[in-house]
UniProtKB/Swiss-Prot annotation:
Domain of life: Bacteria
NCBIfam families according to UniProt: L28
Transmembrane helix recorded as keyword: no
GO MF term list: structural constituent of ribosome
Family membership: Belongs to the bacterial ribosomal protein bL28 family.
Descriptive protein name: Large ribosomal subunit protein bL28
GO terms under cellular component: ribonucleoprotein complex; ribosome
Biological processes annotated in GO: translation
Pfam families (alphabetical): Ribosomal_L28
The keyword Ribonucleoprotein belongs to this UniProt entry's keyword annotation: yes
Length: 63
């Protein structure tokens, strides 16, 4: 499954996680991506959308 939102372009972020003793380990933060059927240019299509775009109404779902 794609790890990028097709509406806002939000994707995976790389960084460093610190423990209490300040040891480092590399890790990734992935967005909450959902596969939904939406209306794109008048036709229903399956796209990958983050949960924030779904909640804010940037996507019109196909029923």
């Amino acid at each position: 499954m794609s790890k990028k939102c097709e509406i806002c372009g939000k994707g995976v972020v790389f960084g460093v996680q610190y423990s209490h003793s300040h040891r480092q380990s590399k890790r990734t933060w992935s967005p909450n991506i959902r596969k939904i059927k939406a209306i794109v240019k008048g036709t229903p299509r399956t796209i990958h959308v983050c949960a924030r775009c779904l909640r804010s109404g940037k996507v019109q779902r196909a029923i």
